[in-house]
Curated annotation (Swiss-Prot):
Annotated membrane topology: Multi-pass membrane protein
GO terms under biological process: adenylate cyclase-activating G protein-coupled receptor signaling pathway
Predominant subcellular localization, coarse grouping: membrane
Gene expressing this chain: MC1R
Protein name (Swiss-Prot/TrEMBL): Melanocyte-stimulating hormone receptor
InterPro entries xrefs: GPCR_Rhodpsn, GPCR_Rhodpsn_7TM, Melcrt_ACTH_rcpt, MSH_rcpt
Subunit: Interacts with MGRN1, but does not undergo MGRN1-mediated ubiquitination; this interaction competes with GNAS-binding and thus inhibits agonist-induced cAMP production. Interacts with OPN3; the interaction results in a decrease in MC1R-mediated cAMP signaling and ultimately a decrease in melanin production in melanocytes.
Domain of life of the source: Eukaryota
Cellular component terms (Gene Ontology): plasma membrane
Protein purpose: Receptor for MSH (alpha, beta and gamma) and ACTH. The activity of this receptor is mediated by G proteins which activate adenylate cyclase. Mediates melanogenesis, the production of eumelanin (black/brown) and phaeomelanin (red/yellow), via regulation of cAMP signaling in melanocytes.
Phylogenetic classification of the source organism: Eukaryota, Metazoa, Chordata, Craniata, Vertebrata
Annotated transmembrane regions: 38-63, 73-93, 119-140, 164-183, 192-211, 241-266, 280-300
Lipid moiety-binding residues (S-palmitoyl cysteine): 315
Disulfide pattern: none
Pfam families: 7tm_1
């Protein structure tokens, strides 16, 4: 089997010409001379993937080691790290296999290569979907902890968290299997795009509401201690910057990939869209970058997790 038949790179079937979406592919002379294609070296792609793997393995191992971190919040963080780990691992594995095939160091047998490609695509796609779900779950967990603080432990119990986690994983695997099987149907692509937009809106609404509550709380404290208003304004500005960074990273890392899916449906033959299609590997690299950033935002900022990680690393040395 030719190497090109395996080079899909995570849903890479979208990077080729789907049969049910007519004439997605364009001839090279139709894309125009000004088409910008950002080439991602395999070495850089592998390096980012390995960094993400190490980070997320540390998060999962640290949470598993410390029983004090077996709360619903840390369960969601652990599952997010596991999802990001699978995203990175799937891409790294696929890239390594592609490089081995290109170097003729691995025999390309259709009976083995194609099923392996399908398995990698399902694992990577399901981990991407679950990663988005767990980002939403973490946002909802924080929201409940702020607005229902007194009832939090009765609302977000460990059994309920485990049920939610199991439901997310099962739904992610089922949806991803259908997506890989019917990737050439526009409705399937649109469902995935709508899912991303729903997660984006959910996170934006929850975090904006949490920021507003935090500002009100800071204002109340300032009035209680007869502080000056600039203190409250400074707190609000800091919170707004944090919120912008949080949602901005999410949108910048995930948005281009889902823009790619949207354009496949809306303008498969337009030269400008075809130029965007050429940067598919760049969009995957941004997702890997998100898998690197997630532990920094959601895991390593927590003091208990950092302390456990430090103790583990110290003992290992």
């Amino acid at each position: 089997m030719a190497v090109q038949g395996f080079q899909r790179r995570l849903l890479g079937s979208l990077n080729s010409t789907p049969t049910a979406i007519p004439q997605l592919g364009l001839a090279a002379n139709q894309t125009g001379a000004r088409c910008l294609e950002v080439s991602i070296p395999d070495g850089l792609f592998l390096s980012l993937g390995l960094v993400s793997l190490v980070e997320n393995v540390l998060v999962v191992a640290t949470i598993a080691k410390n029983r004090n971190l077996h709360s619903p919040t840390y369960c969601f963080i652990c599952c997010l790290a596991l999802s990001d780990l699978l995203v990175s691992g799937g891409n790294v594995l696929e890239t390594v296999v592609i490089l081995l095939l290109e170097a003729s160091a691995l025999a390309a047998r259709a009976a083995v290569v194609q099923p392996l490609d399908n398995v990698i695509d399902v694992i990577t796609c399901s981990s991407m979907v679950s990663s988005l779900c767990f980002l939403g779950a973490i946002a909802m967990d924080r929201y409940v902890s702020i607005f229902y603080a007194l009832r939090y432990h009765s609302i977000v119990t460990l059994p309920r968290a485990r049920q939610a986690i199991a439901a997310i994983w099962v739904a992610s695997v089922l949806f991803s299997t259908l997506f890989i099987a019917y990737y050439d149907h526009a409705a399937v692509l649109l469902c995935l795009v709508v899912f991303f937009l729903a997660m984006l809106v959910l996170m934006a609404v929850l975090y904006v509401h949490m920021l507003a509550r935090a500002c009100q709380h800071a204002q109340g404290i300032a009035r209680l201690h007869k502080r000056q208003r600039p203190l409250h304004q400074g707190f609000g500005l800091k919170g707004a910057v944090t919120l912008t960074i949080l949602l901005g990273i999410f949108f910048l890392c995930w948005g281009p990939f889902f823009l790619h899916l949207t354009l496949i449906v809306l303008c498969p033959q337009h030269p400008t869209c075809s130029c965007i299609f050429k940067n598919f590997n760049l969009f995957l690299t941004l997702i890997i970058c998100n898998a690197i950033i997630d532990p920094l935002i959601y895991a390593f900022r927590r003091q208990e997790l950092r302390r456990t990680l430090k103790e583990g690393l110290t003992c290992s040395w």
